[in-house]
Amino acid sequence: VQLFTHIYQLKLIPPTGKSCIFACELPLKEIEVMKAYFIAILTLFTCIATVVRAQQMSELKNRIDSLLNGKKATVGIAVWTDKGDMLRYNDHVHFPLLSVFKFHVALAVLDKMDKQSISLDSIVSIKASQMLPNTYSPLRKKFPDQDFTITLRELMQYSISQSDNNACDILIEYAGGIKHINDYIHRLSIDSFNLSETEDGMHSSFEAVYRNWSTPSAMARLLRTADEKELFSNKELKDFLWQTMIDTETGANKLKGMLPAKTVVGHKTGSSDRNADGMKTADNDAGLVILPDGRKYYIAAFVMDSYETDEDNANIIARISRMVYDAMR
């Protein structure tokens, strides 16, 4: 007498993405054989998918090489998905973050708010002396030469979406200082970066901007960590962060520049001045991209020490962003 199991099913998803379901009724003694058979099939599909992906990334690197041929700039790229890193290009280089570090600042501020149960609508008092001149600050234009109050929600929107430098430095002080922020990000198991300067500090000398740096993969990993992990017990804080990133007004010609019009991109840009020789320290963009099928990837694109025009720098980022988008699909 043979004892039978219930219907034995296995769903296979080959690299094509189309699934197929096998169902059969088997004697118990044959189940282990069938398991081994199906595991072998799954392993084969996994190996094929891995080889295909590796070929795609190799082709992508070659296309990036061709794009950058003759360009007077150092470019770094990293792409991460929920399965890990997919692409690293010049990942050994320490790229100056510029205003991209405002994302790090926001995470530390939200961590404090979460731990102390502080509302996004809490009021912050700002002194006129905190609105420094000679720096990019839409907030100062709105409140010229006066003390004022503002919610934390609005202050963070100014810092991230509008890349306001004064708002950023106020948030750095609120979070506990730049060293505290640096230590907090390291506690998230993110290495290969350093933060030691405020926005005002970065404006103190041309060399100072290089002190806030990151490798591309460290930045992409931080984006993934902030999105996939529950860093805050209050879900509203995470939702607010990513909506603010999606609402970013700067750098529309960078990561988003050549993507389909309705593509959802939550990103933070960074840009520097030029030195006397016309060299631009950095043009950056880093963020999350959501594909039409709901899959996500995290990308950091850094352009350093560039003698190309601002338009060319943005075009480099936009074209690489589109290459990655097409490869991910």
Question: What residue spans do the PLM features occupy?
Answer:
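Flexible glycine/proline-enriched surface loops and loop-helix/loop-strand junctions
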Residues: 89-91, 151-155, 162-168, 199-207, ...
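Beta-lactamase-like hydrolase cores
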Residues: 55-96, 273
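Active-site SXXK
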Residues: 96-126, 159, 299
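Short, well-structured active-site flanking segments
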Residues: 111-131, 178, 182, 234-238
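Bacterial Sec-dependent N-terminal signal peptides
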Residues: 1-8, 12-57
